[in-house]
């Protein structure tokens, strides 16, 4: 599998993330982590993520994959706050790496399909040290 910089010949689109549409769920210790993604339409995919611990939502995030200015970008809004732009840095058919080196943390957001699993990762420098958090999820029925 080739993984390289995004080239002008075959720019990825939101259609390449179609496999992500639907509902995903995993565990982080005692917490349940969920992401729900729409099907691609209008050069955009809309998503919602939340983490529930002890029957309480402890974090949530509105998200988009959007084609902007000829580039695919990941646009999260943690806790419903200000939107942050992470342009696509590199991709393959099953792995998409979005990067914003000017963001505090994370600087990279990675979505990867591994067989039937979704592995979503955030990584970068935090307090002067490299940090990586991985969220492994399975596709579940949307309610």
Question: What are the functions of these language-model segments?
Answer:
Residues 1-4:
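Bacterial N-terminal signal peptides
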Residues 9-23:
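N-terminal helix-cap/turn-to-beta initiation motif at the start of protein domains
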Residues 20, 68-70, 115-116:
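A short, compositionally biased
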Residues 27-102:
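Central antiparallel beta-sheet cores of small beta-barrel/beta-sandwich binding domains
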Residues 33-36, 109, 121:
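Periodic aromatic/glycine/histidine/acidic cluster detector
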Residues 36-40, 66, 111-115, 137-139:
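Aromatic-rich beta-strand edge motifs centered on tyrosine
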Residues 83, 88, 93, 113-143:
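Edge beta-strand at a domain terminus
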Residues 104-107:
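Charged, amphipathic alpha-helical segments
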């Amino acid at each position: 599998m080739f993984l390289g910089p995004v080239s002008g010949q075959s720019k990825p689109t939101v259609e390449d993330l179609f496999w992500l549409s639907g509902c995903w769920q995993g565990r982080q210790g005692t917490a349940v982590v969920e992401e729900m993604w729409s099907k691609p339409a209008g050069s955009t995919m809309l998503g919602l993520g939340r983490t529930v611990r002890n029957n309480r939502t402890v974090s949530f995030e509105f998200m988009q994959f959007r084609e902007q200015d000829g580039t695919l970008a990941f646009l999260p809004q943690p806790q419903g706050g200000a939107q942050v732009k992470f342009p696509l840095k590199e991709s393959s058919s099953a792995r998409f790496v979005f990067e914003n080196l000017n963001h505090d943390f994370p600087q990279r957001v990675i979505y990867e399909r591994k067989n039937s699993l979704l592995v979503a990762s955030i990584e970068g420098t935090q307090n002067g040290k490299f940090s990586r958090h991985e969220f492994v999820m399975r596709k579940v029925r949307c309610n």
